[in-house]
Design a protein with these regions (language model features):
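A short catalytic or substrate-binding loop motif that flags glycine-/basic-rich loops and adjacent residues
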Residues: 47, 59, 158, 217-218
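Modules that initiate DNA replication and primer synthesis
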Residues: 72-76, 84-91, 105-127, 168-172, ...
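Signature for HUH/AEP ssDNA processing cores
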Residues: 1-105, 111-132, 232, 296
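Catalytic "initiation/cleavage/transfer" segments centered on a nucleophilic residue
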Residues: 137-196
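Proline-rich low-complexity regions
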Residues: 52, 143, 165, 285-288
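Residue-level preference for alpha-helix termini and adjacent loops
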Residues: 61-63, 160-163, 211
Length: 305
């Protein structure tokens, strides 16, 4: 087995009780109650068929999750997904995510973890990212289920699957932080360097309240809470940059400087809103990733991913 194949299999490992496979005759996916074996994955990478994997495992854990963002049905003909803008947002907040193109031309935004964690915790963190990126959690977020039950016949449920990238080895490709399309080998190396431990990502919980209140001002204020906590000496300038970048595509538009001053900044100057979390601010204020005190991603069994 070549290294990129082994990395792909590990990075997209999920439920072993079944998977989805596309039937070109019906133009639909069928759920197969069988293990997605190495041969099945190889057939996907060779282009023989297209498969989808269920992130949640039989023990209700998951080692990865994905936000499926595909607004094409709400856009005019000829619409092209703004991948460059999405990547700028991810880069700005240093979010631990990688982006691949979906089958329909939208974005699959993936979080990769060093081992399986409770699915509810993985899903909850992905909702935080969806909230700050898109202002809503009303999107398809995988794992969709946080606990697998049993059907009416007493059989164990298998969960919902999501299409895998790189069908045929060269479609639904991954983009790096600069927006460059990556071949399979490059993508597996890139994603392997972005595998994280869930506990190290706790600071990102500040990006949204537990009830995820929608609206431009709510989203911007909560981003401000995060930025003030982790960049206390420069948070006001960062909030202004956040406003221009993240609210450019918001239905309410970018806040004017006057609006920003009289609402978000005024509130944040008066009070700290991060008492519910106990993570420490970064010791090196010049380093936006200094709060990551755990093992570096490159040290987490990179050869296996």
């Amino acid at each position: 087995m070549i290294k990129s194949e082994a990395q792909f299999i590990n990075l997209y490992s999920g439920n072993q009780q079944g998977y989805g496979v596309y039937d070109p005759k019906t133009n639909e996916y069928e759920f197969i109650h069988a293990t997605p074996t190495v041969e099945v994955i190889r057939d996907h990478l060779s282009g023989k068929h297209s498969i989808g994997v269920v992130p949640i495992r039989a023990d209700n854990t998951s080692s990865w999750g994905t936000i499926d963002h595909d607004p094409h049905h709400k856009k005019p003909d000829g619409y092209k997904y703004p991948f460059a803008d999405l990547q700028k947002k991810i880069n700005f907040l240093d979010l631990p995510l990688v982006v691949t193109k979906s089958k329909r031309g939208g974005a699959h935004i993936k979080l990769s973890l060093d081992k399986p964690y409770p699915a509810d915790k993985v899903q909850h963190l992905l909702k935080k990212f969806a909230y700050t990126l898109f202002g809503t959690v009303n999107l398809e977020i995988f794992p969709k289920q946080i606990k697998l039950g049993y059907d009416d016949e007493g059989k164990r449920e298998c969960g919902s699957y999501i299409n895998l990238p790189y069908k045929g080895g060269n479609t639904r490709v991954m983009l790096n932080s600069e927006g460059k399309e990556l071949n399979l080998e490059e993508a597996m190396k890139y994603e392997s360097s972005r595998v994280h431990r869930l506990d190290d990502l706790k600071p990102f919980k500040l990006l949204a309240k537990k009830d995820f209140p929608e609206g431009r001002n709510n989203k911007t204020h909560q981003a401000g809470v995060y930025l003030k906590k982790h960049f206390p000496e420069d948070y006001e300038n960062r909030i202004k940059e956040y406003n221009k970048l993240f609210n450019a595509d918001d239905p309410d538009g970018v806040l004017s400087i006057k609006e920003l001053e009289s609402t978000i900044l005024k509130s944040l100057r008066r009070k700290d809103y991060d008492q519910e979390l106990n993570e420490d601010a970064p010791k090196n204020k010049a380093d936006p990733t200094a709060w990551r005190m755990g093992t570096k991603a490159s040290e987490i069994r990179e050869t296996e991913y």
